[in-house]
């Protein structure tokens, strides 16, 4: 029904990165609610068609990890982040209802969306068959060290980000590389969402100036991308072995793709696009490796352990 629905209110109505470039938490909540309502309506219309197939929603899940698991304030910070950025779409889409904790949080801030009682019936009766998961990075949060000052509701009043020591970073994006997050997502869906079928619809890394990794024959030797994929697949494989219902894995992206925010600055593809020369697309090393991965339905790690 939607791809990354939370991005619209988050980036357009909270953090001013996307159109309409406003900072209004109440509008953000109303927009998010209407997106969920539209998604549920799409599910309803699909059911009316009695067509073969299934229908789902694609969510960009970012597991929230608190700095100190033994600190109640840090725990509350990560819970607030999870409620606002993950469960706000995951729960109504899969369970047909909003988390009571989220409703209380919004009510406490006087930002509950306007709604009709029949809307809630619509959401309850039209849940999805599967979930698509876009996973790139976690959120590392703690309770605020100083009060957050704003004349409108902003989720940031409940938390602040921090960077863990010795974490792996994709410096091109400023995103932490934390492959275990994909496992945690799978276990969460297994334990808290009825083990709903799901697939990884996006996973990958955008890297700037990949020309520096090009060999004399013009192939990008992107071993860093191969390592990224392997590490995530190993954790995904573990989630499946432990009963997770993941049925597929897609990369973002097959080709270097154009971004709304930075054009071709960060390259995500397994296949290189040379926009300067308008040349024929060329395989990167990762493309050859991924083809072998697909043909063999797995790979053998350096330690000889199979991942299939």
Pin down the residues of each PLM region:
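Active-site region of glycoside hydrolase catalytic domains
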Residues: 1-308
């Amino acid at each position: 029904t939607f791809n990354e629905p939370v991005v619209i209110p988050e980036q357009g109505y909270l953090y001013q990165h996307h159109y309409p470039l406003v900072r209004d938490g109440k509008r953000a909540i109303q927009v998010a609610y209407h997106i969920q309502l539209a998604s549920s309506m799409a599910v309803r219309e699909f059911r009316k068609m009695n067509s073969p197939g299934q229908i789902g929603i694609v969510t960009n899940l970012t597991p929230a990890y608190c700095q100190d698991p033994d600190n109640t304030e840090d725990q509350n910070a990560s819970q607030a982040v999870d409620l606002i950025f993950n469960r706000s779409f995951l729960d109504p889409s899969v369970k047909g209802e909003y988390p009571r904790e989220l409703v209380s949080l919004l009510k406490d801030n006087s930002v509950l969306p306007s709604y009709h009682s029949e809307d809630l019936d619509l959401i309850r009766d039209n849940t999805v068959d599967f979930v698509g998961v876009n996973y790139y990075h976690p959120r590392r949060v703690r309770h605020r060290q100083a009060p957050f000052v704003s004349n409108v509701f902003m989720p940031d009043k409940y938390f602040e980000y921090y960077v863990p020591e010795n974490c792996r970073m994709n410096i091109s994006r400023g995103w932490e590389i934390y492959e275990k997050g994909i496992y945690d997502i799978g276990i969460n869906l297994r334990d808290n969402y009825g083990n709903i079928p799901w697939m990884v619809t996006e996973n990958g890394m955008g890297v700037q100036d990949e020309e520096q990794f090009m060999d004399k024959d013009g192939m990008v030797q992107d071993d860093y991308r191969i390592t990224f994929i392997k590490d995530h697949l190993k954790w995904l494989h573990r989630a499946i072995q432990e009963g997770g219902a993941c049925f597929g894995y897609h990369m973002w992206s097959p080709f270097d793709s154009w971004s709304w925010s930075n054009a071709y600055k960060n390259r995500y593809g397994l296949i290189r696009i040379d926009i300067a020369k308008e040349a024929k697309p060329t395989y990167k090393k990762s493309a050859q490796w991924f083809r072998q991965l697909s043909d063999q339905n797995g790979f053998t790690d350096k330690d000889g352990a199979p991942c299939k």
